[in-house]
Swiss-Prot record:
Cystine residue pairs: none
Record's subcellular location: Virion; Host cytoplasm; Host nucleus
Organism from which the protein derives: Measles virus (strain Edmonston) (MeV)
Residues covered by region (Ncore): 1-403
Name by which UniProt lists this protein: Nucleoprotein
Amino acid sequence: MATLLRSLALFKRNKDKPPITSGSGGAIRGIKHIIIVPIPGDSSITTRSRLLDRLVRLIGNPDVSGPKLTGALIGILSLFVESPGQLIQRITDDPDVSIRLLEVVQSDQSQSGLTFASRGTNMEDEADQYFSHDDPISSDQSRFGWFENKEISDIEVQDPEGFNMILGTILAQIWVLLAKAVTAPDTAADSELRRWIKYTQQRRVVGEFRLERKWLDVVRNIIAEDLSLRRFMVALILDIKRTPGNKPRIAEMICDIDTYIVEAGLASFILTIKFGIETMYPALGLHEFAGELSTLESLMNLYQQMGKPAPYMVNLENSIQNKFSAGSYPLLWSYAMGVGVELENSMGGLNFGRSYFDPAYFRLGQEMVRRSAGKVSSTLASELGITAEDARLVSEIAMHTTEDKISRAVGPRQAQVSFLQGDQSENELPRLGGKEDRRVKQSRGEARESYRETGPSRASDARAAHLPTGTPLDIDTASESSQDPQDSRRSAEPLLRLQAMAGISEEQGSDTDTPTVYNDRNLLD
């Protein structure tokens, strides 16, 4: 048996290992397409600011698409460094594209004010054609979808400080788009606006240079579609992180935005570790979790073996990302989500509508948190030097805090309906007093009579018909238990029926001598 277990552990490790690049096989290269990236040909701030202005207009032009957009974005992303050409050549290793650098200098003979650097050849016409200045109609279109402040006609400046502020403002808006361009583009606008407000308050960006929504939508779409652009952005982030010493202000801002980009698309894996394993609840000892715990251990080792690009595997479209999906450990993931919605309010808005979601283990996680409230881990207490008296004090305080949280209905709405608790007893009903209290007592008596005459099903309807409207009923998450036949009386359908019956009985008034009993068929009619 010991040999079998060792073989199993070795099999799991080898199964999840990334492929090793060895053997006599040659490198597989795809059919490359050429991307032209304009870069400044001198160190003049005027050249850089004019190039930035022309590239922003070029991206806003609806007639421009494909590799030309990608080259323009790479040119903007590399403008903050002293030598953009060296940076691009150093970090670019893409098997799908071939990047051609095109140096740009000032020119008084072209409509765009720029020309391509060449030896003895006039390239003004080619520069105007590239920057879409050869057609007046196209030039007008390039201004559409630019800045929200229409009073800004251009962003050409001559001092380095002003240029860095404008460039940093534009780069911040571009980098924020990478956070959800691939994983959640439909809900990205709200989070992008929060990031913009944050950096505006920190004076990292200038509010007047807020780009229009249409311009941002174009950039978000090209980021989502173009893998080569995302590879360049991830390579640039990793290169900035490797830079020793103090970094430029724009580089520090990019690292700050990276906290929203890193581990995008890996929420299931990260949250399962956080709430399923790190909480160290005794439920981890279940036999059902043994295999998935071994799988998760192998995935954590694989994550470390992948190195620095591991947190960006979804943005890089790495095929190994499928191993980290929640479908590889569905029971442990469902349990971790139940723990999460009880511990953190932010987890209440997560969507659990997956085919492999198991409501039984979700409720296990919820109940594990509720019943373990106020308990102190003996192992952790011994490591921290906590005495038994201190542990009792902490447990007492934690229990009062938990009760206060439940009484104020604080937390995610998933936590307000228990799937494992029984029905509320008569002594636990809220005291209403006066006429309403008498009505509740009357309904209880009628319910007992109805139980003796018609059986438990009709009696339950009689009790529901006179439930006071002040009783809180939360049905937002009751649908999660509808898949379990044993919990059908606590599912969304009975709760909806109770609420509807309470409304009907309230309309009849308090002077009714013989209250009417409504069943399911009455409500459906």
